[in-house]
Amino acid sequence: MMNKLSEEEIQDKLKKFDGWTYAKKSIHTSFQFENFKEAFTVMTRIAFEAEAQQHHPNWGNVFNELEISLSTHDADGVTEKDFKLARAIEDIVESTN
């Protein structure tokens, strides 16, 4: 099991993640895409990465907007696993722009 990070550790790590915030035991972000197809394409790529990492986002999609929250349920908070997936998500989104 991964160790839960302290709020100070989380805030420090978030400095490397533009547009991500910490609230309610999770890290959160949102993205806006050109259209639904682009949003869904990114979601599909994230889904494959999440499956490979065996760590899955809590997310929502309305048309061209995607909201993502990450936390580690077993640790009841944020762990390194969340930041690893967040980095992969950032890389996926950047590669589509």
From Swiss-Prot:
Keyword Lyase in the entry? The reply is yes
Pfam families given in the database record: Pterin_4a (PF01329)
- Molecular function (Gene Ontology), one example: 4-alpha-hydroxytetrahydrobiopterin dehydratase activity
UniProt-listed SUPFAM superfamilies: PCD-like (SSF55248)
Q: Name one GO biological process term.
A: tetrahydrobiopterin biosynthetic process
InterPro entries xref list: PCD_sf, Pterin_deHydtase
From what superkingdom does this record's organism come? Bacteria
Protein's UniProt keywords contain Lyase: yes
The alphabetical list of record keywords is: Lyase
The catalytic activity, as recorded, is: (4aS,6R)-4a-hydroxy-L-erythro-5,6,7,8-tetrahydrobiopterin = (6R)-L-erythro-6,7-dihydrobiopterin + H2O
Name the EC number(s): 4.2.1.96
PANTHER family from the UniProt entry: PTERIN-4-ALPHA-CARBINOLAMINE DEHYDRATASE
Q: Which family does it belong to?
A: Belongs to the pterin-4-alpha-carbinolamine dehydratase family.
Name the NCBIfam families on file. Answer: PRK00823.1-2, PRK00823.1-3
| Name of this protein | Putative pterin-4-alpha-carbinolamine dehydratase
Q: What is the lineage of its organism?
A: Bacteria, Pseudomonadati, Bacteroidota, Flavobacteriia, Flavobacteriales
